């Protein structure tokens, strides 16, 4: 099945990263890690959309959708991951500037991915996490850790109104 196939590949990839002690050293490592932890979710969703609604999407954009969301999480949790888990998902030599650029590049792919979604329920399902990711990135650019509760609530209302 679609879900079994995606979760099997994800489990294999995560096992590989666990054996590597979650050490991300290069952009290629980051791409590989984010593919297994989030890009595959985008691929799985795309396969489900095609199966259930006949909606076809671009695989690379689906991966970008997942990667973009994960890159925002990496940025948001960077210090906590380091302090509490002793792990950094940031490639060697990268500053937050490069990590922001990585997130923005993948969120741009996610925005393009959204254009392939033609069924309202599917669009809503994907649009809210993406809108929250964009606004969280903006909040972090402004020096805040996260969005306020009021901003989250307003974003939910905005997405539902579309």
Q: Where do the PLM segments sit?
A:
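Catalytic cores of Mg2+-dependent Asp-rich isoprenoid enzymes
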Residues: 1-69, 75-162
């Amino acid at each position: 099945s679609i879900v079994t196939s995606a979760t099997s590949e994800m489990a294999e990839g995560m096992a590989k990263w666990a054996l590597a002690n979650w050490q991300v050293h290069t952009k290629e490592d980051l791409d590989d890690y984010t593919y297994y932890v989030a890009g595959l979710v985008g691929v799985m969703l795309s396969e489900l959309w095609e199966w259930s609604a006949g909606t076809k999407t671009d695989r690379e954009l689906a991966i970008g959708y997942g990667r973009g969301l994960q890159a925002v999480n990496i940025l948001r949790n960077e210090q906590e991951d380091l302090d509490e888990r002793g792990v950094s998902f940031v490639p060697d030599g990268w500053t937050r500037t490069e990590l922001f650029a990585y997130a923005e590049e993948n969120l741009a792919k996610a925005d393009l991915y959204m254009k392939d979604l033609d069924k309202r329920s599917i669009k809503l399902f994907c649009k809210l996490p993406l809108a929250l990711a964009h606004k969280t990135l903006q909040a972090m650019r402004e020096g805040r850790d996260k969005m306020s509760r009021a901003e989250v609530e307003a974003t939910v209302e905005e997405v539902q109104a579309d």
